[in-house]
Amino acid sequence: MSSATQSARFSPSPISVEHLGTIGYVDAWDRQRELAAERAENVGTDTLLLLEHPAVYTAGRRTEPEDRPTDGTPVIDVDRGGKITWHGPGQLVGYPIVKLAEPVDVVRYVRRLEQALITVCTDLGIVCGRVDGRSGVWLPASFDNGQWLPERKVAAIGVRVQRGVALHGFSLNCNSVLTGFDAIIPCGIRDAGVTSLSRELGRDVTVEEVTPAVTAAVVAALDGELPVTEHDIERVTFDSAAAGTTSSAPTFTTVQYG
């Protein structure tokens, strides 16, 4: 059996799912740590927390001072990987508190989460995938109706593994108001943007609509029932100089990674 079809979890028991509704970040963080302490001692069950947060910025361990809000908005410093991000209404947040199979492979675990979210977005009709060297789920850059759209992230992932147990997780922008990202450098990436399911599909896509599909996909991915496949997006760049001097149309350079 290949690693792509093996469970990423130590326990064969089913994952428990808790729907917490809208909950403050610190309260949800406390719940994460409570569950993680139990799982580290082989007590309780692996649990997927699904929720929304009131608007809040959280900064991972690699956040640089220049990544932080330009308007002085407070930030909660957390112990996950990655840099700064925004959470808020209209964004589905998932925290799988899971004791990982041994030997612990954090990269493989992150790829499982990405696979689950790529599957959900693809089933909705969105062309998306991974970007080499960047976690999360991305849409390729494109030139649409005269407007250049850079690569943009629809789902972010940031995790921590402590005593063999994964904490933190993912966020999927459903019908979020994306202006919350304007005051920061999301995930510390300056040459890309953020987007939402609603923006890409041209209709209102709610947290309630996608929650069942996300739940099923995350559970299947972690249990090895949803194999990890290659989903690297096509990298497209816009050569503005060439567009302005040699042609009325933009020039694209495409590179396939993977």
Swiss-Prot record:
Active site: C187
Pathway note: Protein modification; protein lipoylation via endogenous pathway; protein N(6)-(lipoyl)lysine from octanoyl-[acyl-carrier-protein]: step 1/2
Binding site for substrate: R80, G81, G82, K83, I84, T85, W86, H87, A156, I157, G158, G169, F170, S171
Localisation per UniProt entry: Cytoplasm
Keywords: Acyltransferase, Cytoplasm, Transferase
GO cellular component, one term: cytoplasm
Pfam family, one: LplA-B_cat
Protein name from the UniProt record: Octanoyltransferase
Provenance organism: Rhodococcus jostii (strain RHA1)
